[in-house]
Amino acid sequence: MNAQRRRKVRAATTLGLAVSLVAGVLTAQPASAATAVTLSVDASAARHAISPDIYGMNGAEAAFAAEIGLPVARWGGNASTRYNFKNHTYNTGSDWYFENIVAGPDNTVESFVTTNRNRGTRQVVTVPMSGWVAKDSPGAHPFACGFPATRFPAQDGFDQWDANCGNGKLNGTNLTGAVPTDTSIPVDASFAGEMVSHLVSQFGPAARGGVPIYELDNEPVLWNATHRDVHPDAVSYDELGGKSTATAAAIKTADPSAAVLGPSGWGYCEWVASGLDGCAPGADAAAHGGLNFSQWYLKNMKDFSNAHGGKRFLNYFDQHYYPQIGGGTDPDANALRLRSTRSLWDPTYVEESWIGPGGVNAPPLQFIRTMKAWVAQYYPGTKVAITEYNWGALNDINGALTEADVLGIFGREGLDLATMWGEPQPAQPGAYAFRMYRNYDGAGSRFGDVSVSAVSSDQGQLAVYGAQRLCDNALTVMVVNKTGSDQASPLSVARFNGNGTAQRFTYSPADLNTIVHGDDLAVHRGRIDATYPANSITLLVLPARRR
């Protein structure tokens, strides 16, 4: 991650965002205090597959990854921008004094692929695209670095363990005049092709169990900040477009069966504008048909495909999503965190951040739906991914509730791939949100893999998500009580086994160290009456009718 990612408070202008409703999802008026929230599930409506890849992470403790059957892991972040597979060296960029670090044996790209292949986890591997990778460097202090004291004796800060390596700032202003070859060597798209060929030689092509997905660098519009010692200039439409098509072509030449993912922008500004334009479409956009950055990126990839006989060079349209909220857990912060998930889908929700009325007054983001609308217009058939996201507070029940809500939204909205950045520790509440979907009973049982219609009369109090499981046809219903009070709510189930019992699994503040298998609930004529504890996640499992 990058220091600039903090909360990205920049000026911007409004963006025309698509408004589209998904069948089976209603935006309801809040229920009154005296009215119980009602829930309904229709097992035959709004059916579509849920991609298992939405439950991914950028990394995870080994036992936890095995416990939840981690489906996909990403090798990326700022260090990947200048990673040199030939000498296993990367540069930390502005994250840590622009230092070249030789990766240990457990931190190489080969080790990452091996570890994840061995546990059945698909891999997303980032390839460099900025034009520079780390040169041969010492394995211990003193390191090669982008702003050495020998060139820049006056800086605001130096590495306490390496006094020659500075932060590249003086009086809070970025220094200029760094010499790229102090740390790096110039490369072009052929380097990415060599890297993919190397991994194919080690692990085979994607079609035979090799690396399945390659990412076109990381947050490129921030290169002139994160990696400003080698790339001080702002990224333009033409630079990113040219480097992306050339690198994608090199990847596809080295492994035609591999998928390509990009552009992996850091957030709102990079979704809509180039580095030259800043945080709103400007002169650079005007010179490219008036399209925002994401729209033009997709169109450029489609045009490149058309010029090469229709061959696909972009398989996943990827952006990063960090909600522009604080990281606190006070009541106001917790309430905002839970509301903010609506920016992923809700056409009535306007951002309560610098993006919203107090800032650029953007219309509702409905981010996943907007990404899908851009794809449908400019490069149909491209999948949609979010390879970095984090709502925070994973050490708190509020973070667990939010993550459970987010995972439910990902499945309902048809996202194809997601990998959390800054994954929870196994004992933290945030980890239990993943367990509720991926291992709720400790025996590997999972939430369903075919999304079905699930509607709440007040999604802000009780969020509900439904899915049918293909292996046994059971209906699974996830209910997230976002309130501080127990909620008694009737659930109606249509076009499924209307009588019998439902298993109940709950994670709540009553015991933050386990998922509790409670008493079964009666299902009578398609109705379940249940009370959902305050600040809880509850999974109901309804078995299919016996034939």
Tell me what each language-model feature is.
Residues 34-334:
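N-terminal catalytic cores of secreted or lumenal carbohydrate-active enzymes
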Residues 245-253, 315, 321-390:
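Glycoside hydrolase catalytic-domain groove-lining segments
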Residues 55, 303-306, 315-324, 389, ...:
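Substrate-binding cleft of secreted/luminal carbohydrate-active enzymes
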Residues 221-228, 265-281, 346-357, 371-400:
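Active-site clefts of carbohydrate-active enzymes
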Residues 2-33:
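Secretory targeting and sorting signals
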Residues 396, 407-474, 498, 510:
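Glycan-recognition and catalytic regions of carbohydrate-active enzymes
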Residues 458-498, 538-541:
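Carbohydrate-binding surface patches
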Residues 521-547:
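C-terminal beta-strand-rich structural cap/linker in extracellular carbohydrate-active enzymes
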